Amino acid sequence: MKRTKKYPFLTLQRQRFHLNFENASSAAGIPAERDFYRWAWSALKNEYRRADISLILLDEEEARAYNRDYRGKDYATNVLSFALNEGEILPCQVSEKLYGDLIICPQVVLKEAAEQGKTPEQHFAHLTIHGTLHLMGYDHIEDDEAEIMEAEEIRLMRAAGFPNPYQED
């Protein structure tokens, strides 16, 4: 009996996870699309049976406009999360389907990675996981919420082969 290779995207399709990926950024040094799939799925797989997420990479000016228009902050940020079914479910509750949008600004991510002594891949992974957790209802406004979210980020980053994103060298 001939064995066939197992490809991650096939597993993702069976789990009904759809990531609509768009790179509208001019930045170089961005990880492959499949990496973003893998990182987002790692956060989702234990809590959602199905998900439909758009992940868009935008240059600083567009990311700044979204941050200004939706959060009232006039600067480009690393990641923005827009949960389309926000408030319908609780974190850690298995749901039928999650819908949401992630916007990542590669220029900000690359600058932060250099400043923090991280690899670009590590920082993109962290922010993809971080943003996906926000879509799932996690937050870090209150200290107790931040502890829960950061613990989950650390666990997922370690599972992906990366160090604790909050540990300084």
UniProtKB/Swiss-Prot annotation:
Q: Is Cell inner membrane given among the entry's keywords? A: no
Compartments it resides in: Cytoplasm
Q: What is its main location?
A: cytoplasm
Glycoprotein found in the keyword field: no
How many cofactors are bound and how? Binds 1 zinc ion.
Where along this sequence does the record place binding of Zn(2+)?
H130, H134, H140
- Which cysteines are disulphide-bonded? none
Swiss-Prot/TrEMBL keywords: Cytoplasm, Endonuclease, Hydrolase, Metal-binding, Nuclease, Ribosome biogenesis, rRNA processing, Zinc
State the family it belongs to: Belongs to the endoribonuclease YbeY family.
What's this protein's name?
A: Endoribonuclease YbeY
- State the organism named in the record: Neisseria meningitidis serogroup B (strain ATCC BAA-335 / MC58)
Provide the taxonomic classification.
Bacteria, Pseudomonadati, Pseudomonadota, Betaproteobacteria, Neisseriales
